[in-house]
Amino acid sequence: MSRVCYVYILLAGILHTSAQVNFRDSDSKSRQENHRPLQISLSAIEQLSNLSQTSELNEILKHLLVERVVGTQGHENVRNYIVDYMRNLNWHVELDEFVDNTPIFGKLKFANIIATLNPTAERFLVLACHYDSKYFKDQVFIGATDSAVPCAMMLDLANTMQSQLNAKRSDNSLSLQLVFFDGEEAFHQWGPKDSIYGARNLAARWEKENKLKHIDVLLLLDLLGTPDPHFYSYFKNTESWYVQLLSAEERLDQAGHLERYSYSSVTPNQQTVRYFQPHSYHAGIEDDHIPFLQRNIPILHMIPAPFPDCWHKICDDASAVDISTVQNLIKILRVFVSEYMHLNI
């Protein structure tokens, strides 16, 4: 009889705990769906714009603009540089290491880098890119836009916004997470088993660990650094957040904070060129977001259409990068992150 009572009490406790977990999950989902940006003032926009440090950005790029094929010394050096950089900013850094079969090279060891401002937070805005470069037989391919520059942008954002982000470090409701995927590039021919190695592994792992539910939005950066990129809203369920990127660009422009920018209202006689187009576009682009999209994670894809002329060509090196454009995009991201996370600027 006592054993039956014990089982009954234990079962009741489990059911009660399960109900609490389901309630918390439902409550968190509601907060994700109802989350809205907190628009910052023009003086705050100016403050964020003035955080740009071209010398520091160039120093970051110097370490990233090297060949980064998985399994090479250059790849290992870049991985260590990113890890050390984020740890020196006092972020929590985790490596998602795994081995997978590849054509040409057989088994290779991969490592996704996950840097988190506050790992105990309930929800995360995730910025992501890949840090490997494509393999070319008998040629050195740097992959400046693909994706050394996006990596540099994310590192620069974390560095230049230290003060603003540190004030949010103890917030357990919402935090910022930076993911540097490994193995995005195919070794032989793009396909479901020869591409996005890191993204496939991490999405599956986080699904198994029930961590995907903590992601509000995954903003993926790719093929960035050439002048005058055109971006579009690729996914209907994140159109409102795409509009925030577009709005950040417009407000930075109107305040005169974008460099060598030909859409500028300050110099209206120039040819009209804006980065974030007020249009949606079903591009069907395959990238690191796919395993997360398949698991119903909201995606923002900051990738230009059309792709840069140097895409997967040897000319995708430092000479393809326009630093003014890169700084402009970082400024837009600073405003977006600040407004998404309700930072006190």
Predicted segments, located by residue:
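N-terminal hydrophobic or amphipathic helices/low-complexity stretches enriched
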Residues: L15-H75, L117
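A non-catalytic alpha/beta surface segment that caps or lines the substrate-entry region
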Residues: R24, E56-T120
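Active-site-adjacent substrate-binding region
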Residues: V217, L224-I345
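Solvent-exposed loop/turn segments at secondary-structure junctions
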Residues: V99-T102, P119-A121, Y131-Y135, G183-F187, ...
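Structural recognition of the beta-strand scaffold that forms the well-ordered cores
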Residues: I114-T116, F124-A128, Q177-F180, D216-D222, ...
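Second-shell loop/turn segments in exported
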Residues: S43-L51, L64-G74, D100-P103, K137-A148, ...
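Cleavable N-terminal signal peptides of Sec/SRP-targeted secreted and luminal proteins
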Residues: S2-Q20
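Acidic/histidine-rich catalytic neighborhood of metal-dependent amide-processing enzymes
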Residues: D138-A255
